[in-house]
Amino acid sequence: MLLAVATRERAACLGRHVGAILVADQRIIATGYNGTPTGFPNCDEGGCHRCANPESYAEGRGYDVCICVHAEQNALLQAAKIGYSVQGSHCYSTLRPCFGCLKELYQAGVTAIRYLNEWAPSDPIEAQAYDALLGELAGRGVVVAPLELPEGLLDLR
């Protein structure tokens, strides 16, 4: 998780900074942080309309038009670019993954997802769908749970 925390520092998003790593056989196979696609201007350079115009979007809205690639997505894509299978791997993220990232992690074969900070949909209907997805994943043996940090470790949240 410490590497995911360090990785999130690369994010240039005007909102949250999120980092994620994929681990297989106790080896880090990919890292990712949230940000614009390769070659696009970063959020802090005006690359994302949603980040540049937050007043235009209600809280929790507009993510479908956000240009940014989520940290978990970037980690999956980096593993694919270099030819690493993520089947059976674990994901460590600084934020509880969104609905889309949970689906993608499952589809890619990730079997455990640990996160540092809580996140949940603010819309009640979306929250129901999210909880249903968590139930489906649990029924398929996929662990989605917060990571308990050892006592005395610097607060990294």
State what each model feature region is:
Residues 1-157:
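Zinc-dependent deaminase catalytic domain
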